[in-house]
Regions:
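Short, small-residue-biased leader/transition segments that mark boundaries at the very start
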Residues: 1-5
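Alpha-helical transmembrane segments of multi-pass integral membrane proteins
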Residues: 27-47
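Interfacial helix-loop-helix junctions of multi-pass membrane proteins
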Residues: 47-58, 96, 141-165
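Membrane-interface helix-loop-helix junctions at transmembrane boundaries of multi-pass membrane enzymes
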Residues: 118-133
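Membrane-interfacial catalytic/cofactor-binding modules of polytopic membrane enzymes
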Residues: 42, 48-104, 108-109, 115
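Membrane-interfacial, low-structure loops and terminal tails that flank and connect transmembrane helices
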Residues: 10-26
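Aromatic-anchored segments of alpha-helical transmembrane domains
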Residues: 37-42, 136-146
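A juxtamembrane structural motif centered on a specific transmembrane helix
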Residues: 8, 169-178
Length: 178
């Protein structure tokens, strides 16, 4: 993942040594992308912290249903104590399902927003930037799906965490490069 990211950043830097000439629409999409990816990273951390990663072991359904029983109030109780949730926690299955489903929904929102940004970048002739972002998004989607299909193997789970880092870093470079 690190080598892929280095190549993408180098390609971006080689493409333009001067500031990118993004129109206002692209700048707004970059800002929106930063917000939705940040929220999704938080949701991923919440999913992991509350042992909800394997609450839905099938795709595209969860427990064989489109909307299985889910307890969003318990799942998103941010005032819960830390100690009792160690090593499996005390949350109900329905609370964990709610957390997992929210992370899945977040992934759909992130994908739609990033695809809008990628399409706008292509229209703006920023082909390498769009291609790099497309590849990073595809990698992250693949790792997320693999986590569900293969029941959360450590290497894929860590790769998924790094993929989130790559996405947010890529977007930050786009946003803050002058």
């Amino acid at each position: 993942l690190g080598d892929v990211y280095k190549r993408q950043v180098k390609d971006i830097e080689d493409q333009n040594r001067t500031p990118w000439n993004f129109n206002l629409n692209i700048k707004r999409l970059i800002n929106l992308s930063l917000v939705v990816v940040s929220i999704q990273i938080f949701l991923g951390a919440w999913t992991s912290t509350n042992y909800a990663s394997i609450s839905c072991a099938d795709l595209p359904l969860c427990r064989g249903q489109l909307l299985p029983p889910a307890d969003f109030i318990s799942g998103f109780n941010f005032l819960q104590t830390i100690g009792p949730n160690y090593l499996g926690g005390l949350l109900s299955d329905e609370a964990r399902v709610a957390i997992h489903l929210t992370h899945r929904l977040g992934s759909i929102v992130v994908t739609l927003v990033l695809l809008s940004l990628i399409f706008s970048l292509y229209k703006n002739q920023s082909l390498k930037v769009a291609g790099g972002l497309s590849g990073t998004l595809a990698l992250q989607i693949g790792l997320g799906i693999s986590n569900v299909i293969f029941s959360l193997p450590l290497l894929i789970a860590v790769g998924h965490n790094l993929g989130g880092l790559l996405l947010i870093t890529y977007l930050a470079v786009l946003r803050f490069r002058e």
